[in-house]
Amino acid sequence: MKNSIIKKALALVCALAMVFTLCACSSNGGDNGSGDSAKVYKVGICNYVDDASLNQIVENIQAQLKAIGEEKGVTFKVSYDNCNEDATVMEQIISNFIADDVDLMIGVATPVAMRMQALTEDTDIPVVFSAVSDPVGAELVESLDKPGANVTGTSDYLDADAIMNLIFANDPDAKKIGLLYDVGQDSSAASIEAAKKYLTDKGVEIVEHTGSTADEVMLAAQAMVADGVDAVFTPTDNTIMKAELAIYETLAKAGIPQFAGADSFALNGAFLGYGVDYANLGVETANMAADILINGADPATLAVKTFDNGTATINTEICTELGYDYDTVAKAFEPYCTKINTITTAESFSDVQQ
């Protein structure tokens, strides 16, 4: 009898121990469980090319996601890669994101965003694009207000007329304007057409030179000098941006001011960059991604975010080399800008203080 009681007591103790063990296992669940464990979101970011503008966007996306994660008590597990303009590499990067079952993709620049859209059509993975100049023209969205599908993002739409105004504010007597761009860049198409219309209406001669490689861009810059243009306009063109450090001296030494569609051009040696704040563009891209993942926002109804185009960035070193007085130039530009910044030539924004 005594042995029977002891055996029953031991059995009860073992049973209770098993119950406590199972409870402990249940309370220590995975990342997506309740309790103290943070929710984990997997985000895949693909950059189109290594240049100052796009790198600045990526850096700010990553920093803002980290800040949001700390504030909201969640974790963003970010996978980042750069395809460096290689379509095959781009395809592989995006395919890897799909295979990894990421919760959201971010495509930096138009070509990446377009390929992400195509490859995710049969999935439920939302895509947030960044630095797409013409989202409607690229057929990424139905409209800026109502994207219509699982794709939305931020646009660096460029007001080409505003840059034309700056060109003629600087030189009212300019008779010949050069357009330097890559015909293969979708991001350049709308701005180039707008510039052509402006210049044609004004009766100004247009000189076009294009390039799709660094060597071709250099030859195009040299051709601008040979043609004696009064100024050069370059839109938000990643091919020219990548070659800017190699061509800026050619134009500056010839006394030709280059007006371009991003502050990164001025950083890399153009006389003036005009357009959006790319650091802020990155922050807002991250905010949209977080809104979709954390708050359940629907990309189909989450409006594309556009920005004030009114910031002009003047490279003061090039300004001096061209023989301009900065104060005179800044005063001439004031009616056409909401803000004027200055910068000196460097490879990246981390190398210089504005």
Stretches found by the model and what they are:
Residues D291-Q354:
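Hinge/cleft segment of the Venus flytrap/periplasmic-binding protein
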Residues V40-A63, I68, S79-V89, G184-S188, ...:
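Extracytoplasmic "Venus flytrap"
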Residues F20-A24:
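C-terminal motif of bacterial Sec signal peptides marking the signal peptidase cleavage site
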Residues S26-N28:
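Bacterial signal peptide processing site
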Residues M1-V13:
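Bacterial N-terminal signal peptides that target proteins for export
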